[in-house]
């Protein structure tokens, strides 16, 4: 009888780690309840608020123009994998099992038909490649379970952007993703580190809801590059702004009466103490005139919040 009790106790202990794991497989729909402007139309030019960027990143962002994405050779390029934290697409997560043992070899996160590559999170203990190994749009990710959270460490991403207004991300950046499921809600939190462009880590998150319709695309549609702007047909044409020539450098700051150092981000702007430095330098606008109610700044009646 004692032997049976010991065997039963050991079986419970052995099963505990597996029991803590959560099934993430399925279709997940994006929840558009935060930062509708950032994840919809896109951030304002010159808006680097909330980013712990350094001077090099700021200067690179101020020379950026969205016309560069319209170049024929860039029209079908993916965003890097940090885009999963700022995009509005749905995703599909698949479990890849060993056909013999049934162990989980990897988790695959689809791109949801968007402009980023799928993510494969390896769970079989394989090491990360050399620091000098080639980069890819999918990066290289390995995962482990911490309680009921899947934690994935990603390296070897290509150079990309932190925001769609040109804030850069270097190919030396790494990202830690936390997948947390609460019933029908899936939260993905990302911690981004970049020794080239960030002075501190950047933390972002995205929420998804289980999608019973199952209509999230498993793969991206075929992309056919073409010249979107006739002016880009000229060989050697690369859209850009030379330092100090970007006409939108101060548009965001002026619209919201922000001092430039507040609009241009940086580590010091992330902390509450920075508010004290704005005393006497910042006057809030009298009323909201943009993005006041829903994405685009219009309520369902077609009026801005100011007009109601």
Regions found by a protein language model. Give the residues of each.
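Sec-dependent signal peptide recognition
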Residues: 1-7
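N-terminal signal peptide c-region/cleavage motif recognized by signal peptidases
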Residues: 15-17
